[in-house]
Amino acid sequence: MTKRTSAKYKIDRRMGENIWGRPKSPVNRREYGPGQHGQRRKGKLSDFGIQLRAKQKLKGYYGDLTEKQFRRIYGEAERVKGDTGENLIGLLERRLDAVVYRAKFVPTVFAARQFVNHGHVLVNGKRVNIPSYRVKEGDVIEVREKSKQNVAVLEAVQLAERDVPDYIEVDHSKLTATFVRAPGLADVPYPVVMEPNLVVEFYAKN
């Protein structure tokens, strides 16, 4: 188990929100952050603090992306025509690990990253082991035949915690998914409020 995987609930506690909507999140039991000082009363956040929190929450949701990774994606969103915040969400949802998670092939986004890294996923019939690989409209993502009896996969397919969004068409009997289109913010089934507009404000000022 990687440090990032073992720390997934610390992200919830740091944000003070159950950002993946999981029943076992410690936030369901307590509302303070991690560490010995977590129970201290939090003061009112400044505009900077609110914007930073929005960025950290979005980074955390997609597997605790590094600042370098997230900043690179944001830079691409900024260069593409249209609303930068909406573009950012679309690019994040195009990540292969995000699609594997959305398709409910695995239970968590951290498991999705590991699953892709270990070569369990095919894109258009070819093995792809890069979690950040950008999926295109019409791409078919599937679990390799040898990996279809993976316990994590079997458990995830049975989960009722997450609905598959309509921008991905999934056949769980075959463990295949087709990426239909890049979504906007309103299309993505986040369990908590995500505010990419605040991320745009953060980078505009910093």
Swiss-Prot record:
Could you tell me what this protein does? One of the primary rRNA binding proteins, it binds directly to 16S rRNA where it nucleates assembly of the body of the 30S subunit.
HAMAP family membership: Ribosomal_uS4_B (MF_01306_B)
Q: Which organism is it from?
A: Ruegeria sp. (strain TM1040)
Phylogenetic placement of the source organism: Bacteria, Pseudomonadati, Pseudomonadota, Alphaproteobacteria, Rhodobacterales
PROSITE patterns xrefs? RIBOSOMAL_S4, S4
Q: Where is the S4 RNA-binding domain?
A: 94-156
Protein name according to UniProt: Small ribosomal subunit protein uS4
Q: Name one Pfam family in it.
A: S4
Q: Which GO terms describe its molecular function?
A: rRNA binding; structural constituent of ribosome
For this record, an example GO cellular component is: small ribosomal subunit
Q: Describe the protein's quaternary organization and the partners it interacts with.
A: Part of the 30S ribosomal subunit. Contacts protein S5. The interaction surface between S4 and S5 is involved in control of translational fidelity.
Q: Which UniProt keywords apply?
A: Ribonucleoprotein, Ribosomal protein, RNA-binding, rRNA-binding
Q: What SMART domains does the entry give?
A: Ribosomal_S4, S4
